[in-house]
């Protein structure tokens, strides 16, 4: 039995082979999504990162094999702005960069939502994030 696509006119090259589900427009079907859950320094002041998939099933440490997958778009890595290990004061930067508000329709007011900052690979620098048109390596970004 052939897998059924949710959109019949979708070309075969628009569905990733590495993902089990059909393409549905949901980001979870396009790439594996990971979040940095912890970024601590060891005794030698080297950054130790712990990531977790969006499914929340297991904690991982980034491996060199993940870099090509990140570059090819097979996986996506994000840092939540609520992460306590961030060294940069994100308060004003995140609000200025993108006013992310959710209107609370049950008359309790406007609430600020957390934002996810994408992590990307830059040649010569390694894993990086960008805020206010400035690129930070993860080593600079975390305490």
Swiss-Prot record:
Sorted alphabetically, which InterPro entries does this protein's record hold?
Answer: PSI_P840_PscD (IPR019608)
Q: Name one Pfam family in it.
A: RC-P840_PscD
Tell me where the transmembrane regions lie.
Answer: none
List UniProt keywords, sorted A-Z: Electron transport, Photosynthesis, Reaction center, Transport
Q: Name one GO biological process term.
A: photosynthesis
- Give residue spans, biased composition: Polar residues: 1-23
Disordered: region residues: 1-25
Disulfide-linked positions = none
Binding partners and assembly = Component of the P840 reaction center.
Query: In its UniProt entry, what is this protein called?
Result: P840 reaction center 17 kDa protein
Species name for this entry? Chlorobaculum thiosulfatiphilum (Chlorobium limicola f.sp. thiosulfatophilum)
